[in-house]
A protein has these predicted regions:
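Beta-rich carbohydrate-recognition and catalytic domains
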Residues: 1-88, 96-166, 174-224, 230-278, ...
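Polysaccharide-binding and catalytic clefts of secreted carbohydrate-active enzymes
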Residues: 171
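Iron-sulfur cluster-binding cysteine motifs and their immediate structural context
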Residues: 281-283
Length: 326
């Protein structure tokens, strides 16, 4: 069991349960899940500590459950090589099925100067949801842990000095009307010399060809790490996010949009006091093309070990609950 500090009160945590015990499973953290409900099984891909033969910061692990209560032991499905100052991480997964393949979009990073990095978006794919996942390369091949992964999306502006900001990443991808839609974070266009977090929306019919532009910014500002699904019952896009993340007043909220560009103000699903403290990086269950699970959807998020009442950076379990529970 994860080492615990003082636990949060039952009123804040009774609706939530552990999906991944990072400490027991041999790594330091678990967060930012991409969740697909397929044929009665939850498939959860999440960001976790890198390891093995590769010195990358992060790796993507995978766990499953048929009841939302008992979960398989997580296994690594995607690693980065950190070769030549590139491909520094495999994090923030977003999985979608398109034209016969499961495409696993993920955030990596590259070195722009000494101890200076920016996030970028890359992709791997598989014919089966449980892998193996092969990464798209600069040679336009698909290979296992290549040293030359192809960067699909760079930050709008590259920075070779501090502050460099986060870069581009934290993507959320769905399929709508035969097209791939992506929302992602980019803070590289500075305001008054400082990074400003914006969310951008892109569309493509080619999984490895995207065209970022500053004109594709949504009305979301300072709303990093979102997860978007399509709500068939309302014929609208739905966004889920932990507001006030990494704080004692964190809460779960959602927004709606008819076009994916203009979003309503976030409304609390679980307000502060009814949601775990210091939570962050949520993902909500949907089908394999990104329609939100109905009538009740599993939502996962990172939180301090065992719901500890402390901001223990980098020591996170993956917890979950249900939006619109029966």
């Amino acid at each position: 069991m994860s080492p615990l500090a003082a636990r949060q009160s039952p009123s804040e945590t009774s609706a939530f349960f552990q999906v991944v015990d990072a400490f027991d499973d041999g790594f330091s953290y678990a967060y930012s899940p991409s969740i697909i409900l397929k044929d009665g099984t939850y498939h959860v891909f999440f960001c976790s500590e890198g390891g093995g033969n590769y010195p990358s910061w992060d790796a993507i692990r995978y766990t499953t459950s048929t009841d939302g209560e008992t979960w398989s032991r997580p296994k690594v499905v995607l690693q980065a090589t950190a070769k030549n100052g590139e491909d520094m991480a495999a994090c923030d997964p977003s999985l979608v099925f398109y034209q016969g393949f499961y495409y696993l979009y993920y955030t990596s990073a590259l070195t722009t100067a000494s101890k200076t990095y920016q996030g970028v978006i890359q992709v791997a794919r598989s014919v089966s949801i449980d892998g193996p996942y092969l990464t798209f390369t600069q040679r336009r091949t698909w290979e296992n842990t290549p040293t030359d992964p192809n960067v699909l999306i760079y930050p709008l502006e590259m920075h070779c000095a501090q502050p460099s900001g986060y870069g581009a990443g934290q993507q959320s991808v769905i399929v709508q009307n035969g097209q791939l839609l992506m929302w992602y974070t980019d803070d590289s266009v500075f305001v008054s010399g400082q990074p400003q977090v914006k969310t951008y929306m892109l569309q493509s019919s080619d999984p490895v060809a995207w065209a970022p532009e500053g004109t594709h910014a949504t009305n979301l500002v300072n709303q990093a790490s979102i997860d978007v699904k399509f709500d068939l019952s309302q014929s609208q896009f739905m966004m889920i996010r932990v507001e006030n993340e990494f704080s004692s007043t964190s809460y779960l909220a959602r927004s709606y949009s008819s076009d994916g560009m203009s979003w309503t103000a976030p409304q609390a699903v679980y307000p502060s006091g009814q949601f775990p403290q210091y939570a962050h990086d949520a993902g909500i269950a949907g089908d394999e093309i990104g329609n939100v699970a109905s009538p009740s959807a599993l939502v996962g998020f990172g939180v301090p070990y065992g719901l500890a009442d402390a901001d223990n950076w980098g020591h996170w379990d993956l917890y979950a609950g249900y939006v619109d529970p029966p």
